[in-house]
C-alpha cells in the first residue's frame, strides 16, 4: 500500500508526510546538480538530472512521497509559448494579448512534455515501492495568469483587467489550457504517477464570481476528465489563498485531497477533513527558526488533526534558505508523534 494513499483507505494512524519543493535549493546535493545546467527548463527536461533531484529528498529524509521535479510552466512552454527563467528574477514569458496569440498557441507544440513522462517512468523504477510518486501541473488560472502578466508575483491587475474586458477570448484561453492540463495529468498517470496534484498559486487574487469561473469550474472539468481514465488515482488540489472560498471549492470540486495554506484555521481543517483529506499547513517560515518553535507549531497541527484524514505538509513550498537539519528534525518529530499517538507533550 502506498503510504500517502493510506488516509484514503481509512488508516488514520498513519500520518503521511512530504513537502512542496522538497527537491530544491535548500539541499546542497540539489545545488550541486543544478549548477551543471545553466537553463532551468533544460534542467527540467533532463531525464537523468531531474530523476536524481526528485529522489534526493527521499534518500535524505525518507518522505512518504516523491514529487516529480518539474515546473508548472512546462505546459505553456510545451505548447510553443515563449517561457524563460532569469536568475534572481524568475519566469519571464511572452505576454498573451490577442486572438492572434491564441491561434499561435494552437499550432505550435514543441513536444517537450514527453521528457516529463520519461522522467516519471525512470523515477518510478528507482523509487522504493512503499513511496508514492506525485505528478503535477499548474491549475489553468495560475498558468493563464503567468501568460497574461508575462511574469509572476505581480498584483495581477493585468490578468484581471484582461478577463473583465475580454470575456470570450479569456474563456477560450481558459478552456484550451484546461483541456491540455487534463491531458498532461492523464499522461503522467499513464507514465506511473500514483497521485496527481494541481497547484493554483494565484487563486487567492480572484473575487467569488471569477474564482468560480476560473478556479472551480476548470478544476472540476480536469478532475472529472482524469477520473474517467484513472478513477482510483487520488487528486490533490491546492487553491492557495482561497480563504472562505475553500469551502465552496470542496463542495463543488470532487477532489480527494485539499491542500491548504498556513492562513487556514485548524478548526476549519478539522471540519473539512470529514469531507476530504486535508493536507497542510505549517508556515514554511517556521522552518527558518529553531527546534523548540518547530516542535510547538507542529504539535498544535498534529493534535488538531489527530485521527483525521490528514497529510502533513507545509502551507507552501520549502524556502531556499531553510536549514536541512530543521527539515530532518520536523520529519523525525512527526514520526515520533505518530508512534506515540498520545496527548503528551513529548
Curated annotation (Swiss-Prot):
<dbReference type="Pfam" id="PF01208">
    <property type="entry name" value="URO-D"/>
</dbReference>
<dbReference type="GO" id="GO:0004853">
    <property type="term" value="F:uroporphyrinogen decarboxylase activity"/>
</dbReference>
<keyword id="KW-0627">Porphyrin biosynthesis</keyword>
<feature type="site" description="Transition state stabilizer">
    <location>
        <position position="71"/>
    </location>
</feature>
<dbReference type="InterPro" id="IPR000257">
    <property type="entry name" value="Uroporphyrinogen_deCOase"/>
</dbReference>
<keyword id="KW-0456">Lyase</keyword>
<dbReference type="InterPro" id="IPR038071">
    <property type="entry name" value="UROD/MetE-like_sf"/>
</dbReference>
<dbReference type="InterPro" id="IPR006361">
    <property type="entry name" value="Uroporphyrinogen_deCO2ase_HemE"/>
</dbReference>
<comment type="function">
    <text>Catalyzes the decarboxylation of four acetate groups of uroporphyrinogen-III to yield coproporphyrinogen-III.</text>
</comment>
<protein>
    <recommendedName>
        <fullName>Uroporphyrinogen decarboxylase</fullName>
        <ecNumber>4.1.1.37</ecNumber>
    </recommendedName>
</protein>
<dbReference type="GO" id="GO:0005829">
    <property type="term" value="C:cytosol"/>
</dbReference>
<keyword id="KW-0210">Decarboxylase</keyword>
<comment type="subunit">
    <text>Homodimer.</text>
</comment>
<feature type="binding site">
    <location>
        <position position="146"/>
    </location>
    <ligand>
        <name>substrate</name>
    </ligand>
</feature>
<feature type="binding site">
    <location>
        <begin position="21"/>
        <end position="25"/>
    </location>
    <ligand>
        <name>substrate</name>
    </ligand>
</feature>
<dbReference type="GO" id="GO:0006782">
    <property type="term" value="P:protoporphyrinogen IX biosynthetic process"/>
</dbReference>
<comment type="similarity">
    <text>Belongs to the uroporphyrinogen decarboxylase family.</text>
</comment>
<feature type="binding site">
    <location>
        <position position="71"/>
    </location>
    <ligand>
        <name>substrate</name>
    </ligand>
</feature>
<keyword id="KW-0963">Cytoplasm</keyword>
<feature type="binding site">
    <location>
        <position position="316"/>
    </location>
    <ligand>
        <name>substrate</name>
    </ligand>
</feature>
<comment type="pathway">
    <text>Porphyrin-containing compound metabolism; protoporphyrin-IX biosynthesis; coproporphyrinogen-III from 5-aminolevulinate: step 4/4.</text>
</comment>
<feature type="binding site">
    <location>
        <position position="201"/>
    </location>
    <ligand>
        <name>substrate</name>
    </ligand>
</feature>
